[in-house]
Structures are given as C-alpha cells and as structure tokens.
C-alpha cells in the first residue's frame, strides 16, 4: 500500500466524504492503516442504510469482532456506562461472565429488539449447530426520532441480517450510514464514526479501534482538538428549539476492539476510558443521554470455553498484559474515541426527514479555516 493510499484513507471515506484530518484537525497518537476499527485484524463492519420517502432515516450497523468465522468463539469483554438512559442487550451477561460472542448490532432505540432478533437469525442461518442453544448477543441503540419516524418500525430482522452479511474489512464510510443514518451530534448531523491507534508492547504492535454511533451533545458544548467551536458556530441550530428533548439529550454507543490480550476486567477498564475521549469533544454527559460502551479483546482465540460446551479440557487458559503495561492502551482508547466522534461530524451532511425536520451538516469550510488560522498563529509564535 502506497503512502498516497494511506493518506487518502486517513483523509476521506470510501464515499469521498472528508474526515477530520482533512480539515486540519490535529490528533495525537499513531493511527492504523485505515484509521478505523477494521484495523484490528479480523474485525468486519457492515451497514444497512434505510432512507425512504420523507419518514425513514435509519438503519443498522453490523460488527463482527472476530470475523464471521469466529462468531461463536467467546471474547474477553467489559461493559461500562457513563449515563444509563439507553439500552445494550447482553450487558448483564458481559458483566457476569466477562465474555461475549456473536456479532454486534447498532440501530435506533425502537429497533433494538429487532436487531437482537436479527443477530440470532443470522447466527441460526450460518451456524445451524447452535440448535436450540440460547444466545445473548449485544444490540445497542441511540434515538433518531427527530429525523426518522421511529414508531414506523422501518428496521426489520432482514435489515440486520443484511448488515451482517455486507460486513467487510478495509476503510469505512462514516456519517449517515447504517445505524448512524438519522443521528445528530452537537446539533449537527452525526452518526457513525471510527478511528484507531497503534500501541507497541514488548516488541509487538497492537491495534486499538473504536467505533461510535454519535447522537449526543448540545451545540454550545462542541470542542474539537481543544478548540471550543460551539461559541463560534451557534447559528442554524434547529434542534435547540425542539421541546421534546432537553439540550444535550441523545446518546452515544462506543465499541472498542483490540487484538491486545486482555482480561475481562482490563476490557472494562478500556470501556471506561471512552468517557474521557467523549469529554474531549465537549460533552459533560447529559442525564437524558444513554452513553454505553463495550470493549473486547480479540486475542486468545479458543481461550474461553463456550458455555455448556467445555469439552475435554478442565481449565481455560489466557495470555494477558500485565496491569503496569496497560496505560498506553487507555491513551489509545481516549484518542480514538475523540477522533471517531470528530469523523462522524465531519462526514455529516445536511439532512431533512420526518415532519420536515432538518439538521445541518458541520460547516466544514469554516472549521477548516479556524484550524488553519490556529496553525498559522502557532507558526508565527515560533518564528
């Protein structure tokens, strides 16, 4: 892969939408090949985007943490919540067992049950050996009812299956795609966003990837790379006049995946660091927001026995990082989360939907000019 291809993947999505780095927004750390959660080996992501007429602005995002072929192999997992006005199915089992298996789906609030059923349907088709065994997959949601007729139940089980079947590796589209189609972030069009960081330990390079469904924050709160923007971009904020929800309401789901070998409690520690990355974008965490996070390690394949199918071995065995080596992975989560939110915003474009509700896209030219002026000012101070 050439340097030009690498730079293109960091600057634009496959659909040609700009990413935050294309606007001159600076970030710390070293991103992976695609600067996406798919930089973690084996991770596959797919979208089912539903835009029909004036009422449907929604969809499903499907994530295979260990590829389709590893869907039944439990991963070390940890769950954390910043604010609990939301739903992530399977979270109680993650907390109890320290593991999860099967794909993950992200969608809208009133379709979370459909997405859960869709994951089970997908697994039953591809893994008939599951038989009558129980499944507790992870399906999570954010509310898209401003742009989408959320009570019309546009999302079906087949949409979820289609998202999982469409999943692949490589660079990812961002913004109004998949479960992020109708989502709003800081009063601008938000949605799906992703980023990654490389972390070296004991001579091995590991990857931490984050995927967010960004649907949170009031306009006045917005910060990018330490630059407050809410005060300079206050105009054209139709959501501020929407009385059905208080400012800052919405929700954000974050999925953190890494190929570093971790214990379940270490995964929980990574999930908690998502909060710090979100805070860098300005939010204080609204009481009306559902901010739920899942972190998993794709290392140690076969390390956990499937529940009820232990087989001949009397013990499970895992390799894991010592706790005193984990801080760089915390930093990677924080940096990737911040950039994933910024990427969701930068890919967003104006959308009109249900009841004529309209949300503007981030004014990218103005944001780019602000960061260009900041960079030029910094250079002058050094001269």
Predicted regions and their residues:
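Alpha/propeptide regions of enzymes that mature by internal proteolysis
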Residues: 2-383
